[in-house]
Amino acid sequence: MVEAAARKGVTIEVVTFDESTHTAAEAAHALGAELGQIVKSLVFVSGGADDLEPILCLVSGVNRVDLARLAAVCGLPDVRRATAREADELTGFTIGGIPPIGHIRRLRVIMDPDLGRYEVVWAAAGLPTAVFPVPPATLRVLADANVAPIAEVTAAPSPGGGRSVVVEPASAPGRPATGTTG
């Protein structure tokens, strides 16, 4: 993984921990970072058992992937979460340590735009106890990622009651929420 970054002219510094950083919450706690700064590397697949097309989603730690949005972004009729075995076979890494780069094969990579809210984000470095810091723009280049809205959209209760406002996940402070009322 470090070599994959070096081939693109980027030096990354891996930080290791005694405790697990397997989940986004564990990583944020260990780093003293915001949950949104943690990059979840999630593997999804499309196709049949003999011809799986892997899709790696780089998602802000506060967000969840919306399968319908991901399928639409990828132009695929059906997408599902990869099993742990499929993720390992398709990337060469186990869940909890899947990095955004350095996989055993080329993957289609989609990046959550909410990661761009931060100067630095933290991504897995190949083990459940290792991460590395990287600016989101550099991450996009390293992973050859397409940035697209793939996160679930949540409905927040309206202060007036009865009506709800659809809010894009992780709206930045001071930035108006997008969506509709109804």
Predicted regions mapped to residue ranges:
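Extended, low-hydrophobicity, polar/charged segments
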Residues: 1-182
